[in-house]
Amino acid sequence: MTDNQLLMQEALEWKMHFLRKDSMFERFSKRVQTKVNERIPEKIHTVVTESVKKMVEATMAGSNIITYKKDTSALSLSEKNELAKKTIVSYQKVAAAEGVGTGAGGIFLSIADFPLLLSIKMKCLFTLSSIYGFDVKDAQERIFLLLVFQLAFSSDDGRKSLFSVIENWETEKKSIDWRVFQQEYRDYIDVVKLFQLLPGVGAAVGGIANYKLLAQLGETARHVFHLRILKETAGE
């Protein structure tokens, strides 16, 4: 098998695993986490909602763009994949260091830095997109990244329909109402998973939580880019 065929096989296996229904244990964990979320003060809910709203607005406006500084156009997809893996690890370390600092101060200090934690994750997506050769100065590519973020933290119910939009992006992007998308974006993210971004909330704490969640986001992005590129290549 060629390198591209191996990457396609890996991506398809990931897709099958990703789209499966949550296990009984995962559903139980989600119910427990939901109970925890219900005890979180309304003030924190408001900060989370506003943080996501500002993240979406900044991304759509292009005010938070960051790109990979080196030209990767001459690299093979396999080489880009290895570079992407190293990039994810690098951002994991940054996120973990931030999580350790905020986690030590409890949930109220953590929520104060929540926008920064979101920013780290979006910077990771911008960098990965740039590595794979996509132009993040293009507004539609930035929307694509928001969808990838949304997919990584989507609920079991909305996962398949969202994945379908991403998988058929070249067609779907023509029919998306960007204003409605921006208004509804927050509602489609699984609140349970969103609160897991907060150090000190959920099964993992502080730096560990951020390290794992950045890995989850990075792996989702990496495989989505593989599927997109290989599909476009096959269609040429």
From Swiss-Prot:
Q: Which residues form a coiled coil?
A: none
Pfam families named among the record's database cross-references: EcsC (PF12787)
Q: Which InterPro entries match?
A: EcsC
Q: What does this protein do?
A: Unknown, does not resemble components of ABC transporters.
| UniProt protein name | Protein EcsC
Species assigned in the record? Bacillus subtilis (strain 168)
Designated gene of the protein? ecsC
